[in-house]
From Swiss-Prot:
It catalyses: Endonucleolytic cleavage of RNA, removing 5'-extranucleotides from tRNA precursor. One of its GO terms (molecular function) is ribonuclease P activity. RNaseP catalyzes the removal of the 5'-leader sequence from pre-tRNA to produce the mature 5'-terminus. It can also cleave other RNA substrates such as 4.5S RNA. The protein component plays an auxiliary but essential role in vivo by binding to the 5'-leader sequence and broadening the substrate specificity of the ribozyme. The lineage of its organism: Bacteria, Bacillati, Bacillota, Bacilli, Bacillales. Its EC number is 3.1.26.5. It comes from Oceanobacillus iheyensis (strain DSM 14371 / CIP 107618 / JCM 11309 / KCTC 3954 / HTE831). The gene is rnpA. It comes from the Bacteria. HAMAP family: RNase_P. Belongs to the RnpA family. Pfam families: Ribonuclease_P. This is Ribonuclease P protein component. Keywords: Endonuclease, Hydrolase, Nuclease, RNA-binding, tRNA processing. One of its GO terms (cellular component) is ribonuclease P complex. Coiled coil: none annotated. Consists of a catalytic RNA component (M1 or rnpB) and a protein subunit.
């Protein structure tokens, strides 16, 4: 994934946590906030040490990055998205992680082919 699509700075993570919206399922927690001044989405990944050793954490991050790469054309631009992996992801393969991620993004209206969530309220 290109560097311009990544969130790396701690301040950006913290700002997304404080000012953004969140939603979750058993496997993933997603925080997001809209940034109208950017023309593409950016992602930040967090996999804690409770998940497993470095090999396990890196495998989960690779799966999440690959899932975003495959979903890239469908994700709405101008969002910062932070994903936190939970413990059940250690037993999932990449296909299951992608399915869980795409379901959450669809549910929250962050995919282009979904209706805006605010129009449902």
């Amino acid at each position: 994934m290109k560097k311009q699509y990544r969130i790396k700075q701690n301040e950006e993570f913290q700002y997304t946590f404080k000012k953004g919206h969140s939603f979750a399922n058993r496997q993933l927690v997603i925080y997001y906030r809209e940034k109208e001044d950017q023309c593409h989405f950016r992602i930040g990944l967090s996999v804690g040490k409770k998940i497993g050793n470095a090999v396990m954490r890196n495998r989960i991050k690779r799966c999440l990055r690959q899932s975003f790469h495959e979903l890239e054309p469908d994700i709405k631009p101008a969002y910062d998205i932070v994903i936190i992996a939970r413990n059940p992801t250690r037993n999932m393969n990449c296909g299951e992680i992608k399915k869980s991620l795409s379901h959450l993004l669809y549910k929250e209206g962050l995919l282009k082919n979904t209706r805006n969530k605010t129009s449902l309220r």
